[in-house]
Amino acid sequence: MITLKQALSLSQDELETLKNEIDAKVRASDLNAYIKAPSLNGASAKGVPILIKDNISVKGWEITCSSKILKGYVAPYHASVMENLHQNSMAGFGLSNMDEFAMGSTTESSCYGITKNPRDKNRVPGGSSGGSAAAVAGGLAVAALGSDTGGSIRQPASYCGCVGLKPTYGRVSRYGLIAYCSSFDQIGPITQNVEDASILFDAISGHDNKDSTSANLKPTQTFKNLNKDKRFKIAILRDHIKDASSEVQLAYENTLKALKEMGHEIVEKKMLDSHYQISIYYIISMAEASSNLARFDGVRYGRRAQNIKDLKELYLKSRSEGFGDEVKRRIMLGNFVLSSGYYDAYYLKAQQMRLIIKEQYNKIFEEVDLIFTPVAPTSAHLFNYHASPLEMYLSDIYTIGANLSGLPALSLPVAKDPLGLPIGMQFIAKAFDEQSLLDISYALEQELDLKLD
């Protein structure tokens, strides 16, 4: 597939040809990365075609978050990132499959069916932005937008062999993103390479008055300032690597060796055990989800239950029939930790621990420029691999720290396991220092020159 950098130089006629080619490929593909052929969404604005995750509002398109309960909901307005794309010669073209309401790590909970990993169709593409990553890796999209709540851009990027960037919280407007966990959610790019990630990130970044959490900063210019010759002081967290598979640990050590040979300084640091982060993340995210999803009641918009006797039954049946099992599980757990008698024991304590984790990251960043970790404990696994929801939650163990602290992080493919599946590593940077993330990733990408195909 043509890169985003190349596509931006095409004429309008050439772009229309490209869109037709993508549409034909999607119709012929069995990956199920797109919810439907992009031409079926209706008219598309002029510009380079960008695949959009199904929780980002595109005016006039049915946006469902891959959930039955939102079937029939047509977005009445554009998300701010869509307006930004249009101002930068790009446009939405197709909606990607995802875990229902972005709650999952495998893209198996979508009401539209599973998405397959293009590297091995018997394996998951990761989640929740699995459709976006599978499409980019499978040559079905020039680039894509995803959302990252606990690793939902970076983990599928790692599983599929793409570049995935989670910007600093507040760097990219969330206006028009259907919320899962409002204090963690962030929109970001999934692309074929680091240059494309930089271009797409620059296009969607910047202050937005419609988002009260938007940082009052101008759009970034990271692509213009990409510098592969910078040298950085990089922290590693040895205690956190113990949960990774032997293949991931080998890729980690080999990448560290490459970074040292490139002239970067590596230092060891310590912070709170990553298993604490899992507990904190899921308590807070489920609590916020139970609040955010209360609006989907069968009354205001989306799917409504039929043959009901009263308002109470309408509410119960609409939500029971409309939400999938994982979403129901998180709503119930969220309501539990917010309930009288348990709020202080769970939610309040989790918020206090979140501050401690944020302070630990800030303390490390007083001495270093970047932190280097794996993205996931393993490469992409087979479908129906997890024996329990808890096992699935543990797959986020390396990615959630950046969400808890609001820091930017980037996933870069660095190696292949013995089965030929991609393995990604991530860099985490100081708040609003996406430039350093992209600089070191750009240099490492060229140094490794990894060929996945």
From Swiss-Prot:
Matches recorded under SUPFAM superfamilies: Amidase signature (AS) enzymes
Active-site residues, Swiss-Prot/TrEMBL: 53 (charge relay system), 128 (charge relay system), 152 (acyl-ester intermediate)
Gene3D superfamilies attached to this UniProt entry: Amidase signature (AS) domain
Biological process per Gene Ontology, one example term: translation
InterPro entries given in the database record: Amidase (IPR000120), Amidase_CS (IPR020556), Amidase_dom (IPR023631), AS_sf (IPR036928), GatA (IPR004412)
Top-rank taxon: Bacteria
KW Protease (keyword) present: no
The keyword Nucleotide-binding is annotated on this UniProt entry: yes
GO cellular component, one term: glutamyl-tRNA(Gln) amidotransferase complex
Keyword line: ATP-binding, Ligase, Nucleotide-binding, Protein biosynthesis
Enzyme class: ligase
EC number: 6.3.5.7
A GO MF label: glutaminyl-tRNA synthase (glutamine-hydrolyzing) activity
Annotated catalysed reactions: L-glutamyl-tRNA(Gln) + L-glutamine + ATP + H2O = L-glutaminyl-tRNA(Gln) + L-glutamate + ADP + phosphate + H(+)
Family, as annotated: Belongs to the amidase family. GatA subfamily.
PANTHER family: GLUTAMYL-TRNA(GLN) AMIDOTRANSFERASE SUBUNIT A (PTHR11895:SF151), TRANSAMIDASE (PTHR11895)
Function: Allows the formation of correctly charged Gln-tRNA(Gln) through the transamidation of misacylated Glu-tRNA(Gln) in organisms which lack glutaminyl-tRNA synthetase. The reaction takes place in the presence of glutamine and ATP through an activated gamma-phospho-Glu-tRNA(Gln).
Subunit text: Heterotrimer of A, B and C subunits.
Name the record gives this protein: Glutamyl-tRNA(Gln) amidotransferase subunit A
Organism, as annotated: Helicobacter pylori (strain G27)
